[in-house]
Curated annotation (Swiss-Prot):
GO terms for cellular component: condensed chromosome, centromeric region; nucleus. This is Shugoshin. InterPro entries: Shugoshin_C, Shugoshin_N. Residues 306-315 have a biased composition (Polar residues). It comes from Eremothecium gossypii (strain ATCC 10895 / CBS 109.51 / FGSC 9923 / NRRL Y-1056). One of its GO terms (biological process) is meiotic chromosome segregation. Keywords: Cell cycle, Cell division, Centromere, Chromosome, Chromosome partition, Coiled coil, Nucleus. Residues 188-239, 262-334, 367-443, 483-518, 628-648 are annotated as: Disordered. Residues 95-122, 208-273 form a coiled coil. Residues 200-217, 262-273, 424-440, 490-509 have a biased composition (Basic and acidic residues). Belongs to the shugoshin family. Its main location: nucleus.
């Protein structure tokens, strides 16, 4: 009973029932009055046990409820955490994907940045190289121009017999120029060197030395090295190169050469430093001067002859003093000539420099001028040359002319445009209907087109109203092939009627071309042959058509090209109709195989007579059986019928 305890109330009921039963049994057992003490003790003990078990069961139940509640909370928290973990995993995966995309994009951007930097560096390097080249070119050109000016001054000094500049200053200038040429690359930073006191003193001393040398120069003597041709400098412009050729103005005189040789012997011991001309002499110029010695020899012979003719009248009463004066006058003439030539060429250099476009690149631009400007410049230059020669010839004896070989070497960059190589473009003109033989400018670029007669396409095809040549003379409708039979027959009839009436048309139109006459004659002969072959019973179709046509409709005359473009429509012979009285029973007739095969109408002798088969009614003609079996069957069904043949 105590093992199956559910609650406190059930235990209490059981204990009360037991106690009541025992009391009854004691009563009924003969014991009346109060119960015995043993029963009370048992009841008290049972009540105590029931209270203890009740308290224990309550505590266990509360513990179990608490455990179940904690378990539920734990499961719920675990589910929440698992769901949160899945969401975090998803977000983490998305973030990782985005991070990888960002990494790829960053790597692409880095590569692009590297490429852009490399391109930028390459472009900067190229720009610096171009800038450096342009600066080097400008510097080289500027120094070259200054060098040309210095050389020009030196040549003028040498020609005039002046003493040149000191050798130390010229060497210093040449060293500077050579140093700049060897350096090649201009410095990025321009530095200004402050001269020291020692350098200033040295320059002052050199200036004092120059002044003393100029004061000590008593005689104006020419040096052999100075008169020799200068080194042919490398110039950018061939026109500048052609302006002044010093070797062309070297005048060889025996007396002058002897005087120069003596002066050279006297001054060879004094001058230790080389002059400017010695540094500029090259082997190329020596070769050119050697090649020009022959030309100079001819010029010397001419000058000797000219001077001999002038001085023959004065040689009789003159002595050594006259010869010395003659040599002096020749020197003065040569100097004046060179001076005039230099003065003549210097303004031309200025004009060319001012008029031409500045060329910064190495390649030479081709500058073209108009013919009027070229002719005016040539006329002015020839006028100036004539004025110079007139002045010199009037005041001085004739001098040596410049040889033709040196003039042929002069190069000119300003050339007129070549008009012979250009294509002459002629405006195009539309063709006219009148086929005149007058010449007119053609528009075609390749070959001439003849518009007089229709092209081969118009002859070979059947054109329509849309596809017609613009210059065709023939009628399109005559070349067409009509699909309608009525129109075709009508046109054939019109053509035949035109052929029939060709004689009248020919008489009416006396101005017709001979080609049209020949065509009409040929057509008439053909039509006459056709008419002979036709049956006399059938009337002509052409006359019927011409009668059916209205009078106002003009007939088409035969064209000149009708025999070329059109085919002659030959009228076919009509099929002969069966005669009214045919010959029946002809042995040679192909159609009469058996008498029963012929039709009833074919056996009539006359239209009004009765035929043989009219007498026999219900007889039908059948085809001839081809096989023996079919023929026997036919004979069995229908008795044998003799072939009715009419003998003639």
């Amino acid at each position: 009973m105590y093992k199956k305890v559910v609650g406190g109330w059930f235990v209490y009921l059981v204990s009360t029932q037991i106690s009541s039963g025992r009391a009854g049994s004691a009563r009924f057992g003969g014991h009346l009055g109060y119960p015995s003490p043993s029963v009370a003790y048992i009841m008290a003990r049972a009540s105590r046990k029931a209270n203890g078990s009740k308290a224990k069961s309550n505590s266990v139940q509360e513990y179990l409820d608490l455990i179940s509640l904690q378990k539920q909370q734990f499961d719920q928290m675990r589910a929440n955490y698992s769901h949160q973990n899945t969401q975090l995993a998803k977000s983490n995966s998305m973030l990782m994907i985005k991070i990888t995309d960002l990494e790829t994009k960053i790597s692409e951007l880095v590569q692009e940045n590297v490429q852009l930097r490399s391109r930028l560096s390459v472009t900067e390097l190229r720009f610096k190289e171009r800038l450096n080249q342009s600066f080097n070119l400008l510097e080289h050109g500027a120094f070259q121009r200054f060098d040309e000016i210095v050389n020009l001054f030196a040549v003028v000094r040498a020609q005039q017999g002046l003493r040149p500049e000191s050798a130390a200053a010229t060497e210093q200038a040449q060293r500077r120029f050579k140093g700049l040429e060897q350096r090649g690359v201009s410095p990025k930073v321009v530095g200004f060197d402050v001269p020291s006191s020692d350098s200033v003193r040295g320059e002052r001393e050199t200036l004092d030395d120059r002044a003393q040398q100029h004061q000590e120069a008593d005689s104006m003597e020419l040096n052999v090295e100075e008169t020799q041709p200068l080194r042919k400098k490398r110039r950018r412009s061939s026109r500048r190169e052609s302006l002044f050729i010093p070797s062309d103005f070297d005048f060889s005189n025996d007396s002058l050469e002897n005087a120069l040789k003596e002066a050279d012997k006297s001054r060879s011991a004094k001058d230790e430093a080389p002059s400017v001309a010695e540094d500029t002499i090259t082997e190329e110029k020596h070769r050119e001067s050697a090649s020009r010695t022959t030309e100079q020899g001819e010029s010397e012979s001419r000058t000797k002859e000219a001077s001999g003719t002038l001085t023959q009248s004065n040689e009789d009463g003159m002595g050594n003093d006259k010869s010395l004066q003659k040599e002096g006058t020749q020197q003065e003439d040569a100097a004046n000539f060179t001076h005039s030539i230099i003065e003549y060429f210097i303004p031309e250099e200025y004009d060319v420099g001012s008029s031409d476009v500045a060329n910064t690149s190495k390649s030479k631009l081709e500058v073209y001028r108009d013919d009027n400007e070229i002719e005016s410049s040539q006329s002015t230059s020839s006028g100036e040359c004539k004025e110079l020669t007139g002045e010199l010839s009037s005041a001085q004896p004739p001098f040596v002319q410049i040889p033709a070989s040196s003039q042929s070497k002069i190069k000119h960059s300003l050339k007129p445009p070549r008009t012979s190589q250009r294509k002459i473009v002629v405006d195009e003109v539309m063709p006219h209907n009148d086929y005149s033989d007058a010449t007119r400018p053609r528009r075609t670029r390749g070959k001439a087109v003849d518009y007089k007669w229709p092209s081969l396409r118009a002859k070979m095809r059947r054109p329509t109203d849309k596809l017609v040549d613009a210059t065709t003379v023939t009628d399109i409708h005559e070349l067409q092939v009509p699909t309608n039979r009525k129109l075709r027959k009508q046109r054939e009839g019109v053509a035949d009627s035109a052929d029939v009436h060709g004689e009248t048309d020919h008489e009416q139109d006396p101005e017709q071309s001979p080609a049209a006459e020949d065509v009409s004659v040929g057509l008439q002969s053909i039509n006459s042959n056709i008419q002979k072959d036709e049956v006399s019973d059938q009337p002509l179709q052409a006359t019927e058509v011409t009668q059916a046509l209205p009078e106002d409709l003009p007939l088409r005359q035969p064209m000149a090209l009708k025999d070329i473009t059109n085919k002659i429509h030959i009228v076919q012979k009509p099929k002969k109709s069966l005669a009214k009285k045919p010959i029946i029973g002809d042995v040679s007739d192909e159609n009469s195989y058996y008498g029963d095969d012929t039709s009833a109408s074919g056996l009539r002798l006359n239209e009004g007579d009765l035929s043989v088969f009219d007498l026999i009614g219900g007889v039908k003609c059948s085809n001839i059986p081809k096989t023996h079996r079919a023929r026997a069957k036919a004979e069995r069904q229908v008795g044998k019928k003799p072939a009715f043949k009419v003998s003639t």
